[in-house]
Amino acid sequence: MIKNHWMKKLKYLSLFFLLFAIYWFPDVILAYPEVYLKSLVGYERQVVATWIFLGNMSISLFLGILICYKLGYYKNTISIFKIKNLLFLLITTIILFVIYFFSYTYYNSHFITPGIAKTQAAFSIQIVFPFVQFITIAICAPIFEEASFRTTIYSFFKNDKIAYIVSCVGFAWMHTGPNPILIVYLPMSIVLTSIYHRRRVLGESILVHGVFNALLPIVIPLLQVITGLYYL
């Protein structure tokens, strides 16, 4: 009994790191362009980097989705499309945008240091075409991050309250590190974790996360124009 308990812990701990290894695999080409693309410059370099990255990303997505499917991570996904669940997700997404808008505006008014995620995004755009960055943040990030920080962490911890706290803090910290921008990512993480915590349906948090990431560059400037709030 005790042995099975610790084997289960080891299984999900290993799975957490495996999912992130697969998730970050395509970023090798972004992290070391001077090694892989040393002889290329300008547009030619960007084209080659983009195709290599897309190839690696396709492999990563296939492996990640396959692993999660085999482990039953996507069970009850169809239930998302019930009217009451769609309405809940729509309202939650709107709330998420509003919370992010105010926390992000406050952060920009008082701090200038970018977080890890923002720095990585700015760097990657210099190497591959912008549409690749969009695919990464709107599709890859939600699939891998939600699987790791929601279902895997909830499977690792027997106590749901501990799992909730670790999921919220861990997700936010992964994006920011020891940085004041944590005040932006922590509320976002709490909302996404709460979505998963409600029914334990991974597809719901993936959907909201993906829509949020995809529309963020449009919604935030729009809210700034509508409210007139650029600083808090």
From Swiss-Prot:
GO terms for molecular function: endopeptidase activity. Keywords: Cell membrane, Membrane, Plasmid, Transmembrane, Transmembrane helix. The chain crosses the membrane at residues 12-32, 47-67, 86-106, 124-144, 165-185, 206-226. It holds the Pfam family Rce1-like. Its main location: membrane. It is found in: Cell membrane. GO terms for cellular component: plasma membrane. GO terms for biological process: CAAX-box protein maturation. It is a multi-pass membrane protein. The function of this protein is currently unknown, but it has been shown that it is not necessary for phage resistance. Belongs to the UPF0177 family. This is UPF0177 protein in abiGi 5'region.
